[in-house]
Design a protein with these regions (language model features):
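Glycine-rich FAD pyrophosphate-binding loop
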Residues: 5, 21-49
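Short beta-strand to alpha-helix junction loop
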Residues: 72-80, 99-119, 129
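General beta-strand structural signal in soluble alpha/beta enzymes
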Residues: 34-35, 97, 128-130
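Short glycine/serine/threonine-rich phosphate/pyrophosphate-binding segments
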Residues: 13-17
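A conserved short coil-to-beta-strand element within the FAD-binding core of flavoproteins
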Residues: 130-136
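Glycine-rich active-site loop/strand segments that organize a redox cofactor
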Residues: 49-99
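Beta1/beta-strand and adjacent pyrophosphate-binding region of the FAD-binding site
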Residues: 1-12, 32
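Conserved beta-strand segments of alpha/beta enzyme cores
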Residues: 30, 94, 125-127
């Protein structure tokens, strides 16, 4: 059995753990998330003033502070902007987009996003250990 350890239980760490667990056949991989905090997702709960700003549909190179906005165009064009929202939809999360293009969970509650991620991690057998420090 292959073992995958994810360091950090923030939004990216939880998403990585979920993706790793989903991509392997059942029983082929053991995924563990290690986080130094007493609970995972602390910053996720604070994002978007507690509403969890998931995405922005109006991203353009001109919105970034850079000497050469044109250099960002091919980078942004290479990103599948719909993929994150499709991923959340596949997990069962309903979203809404406000007039400024910001995407939030339909409930407007970051806690619902965290609960959804944690529920899928539990269902897939991902072990989450909090209060851990990792030394190299």
């Amino acid at each position: 059995m292959q073992q995958i350890v994810i360091l950090g239980g923030g939004a990216a760490g939880l998403a990585a753990a979920l993706a790793a667990a989903q991509s392997a056949p059942a029983g082929a991989v053991r995924v563990t998330v290690l986080d130094r905090n007493p609970r995972c997702g602390k910053k996720l709960l604070a994002t978007g003033n507690g509403r969890c700003n998931l995405d922005n549909t109006g991203i353009a190179p001109e919105q970034y502070f850079t000497a050469d906005p044109a250099a960002l165009r091919p980078l942004l064009a290479a990103v599948d902007a719909a993929a994150p929202l499709e991923w959340f939809a596949a997990l069962g999360l309903y979203t809404r987009t406000d007039e400024a293009g910001r995407v939030y969970p339909y409930s407007n509650q970051a806690a619902d996003v965290l609960a959804l991620l944690e529920g899928h991690l539990t269902r897939l057998g991902v072990e989450v250990r909090t209060g851990c420090t990792v030394q190299t």
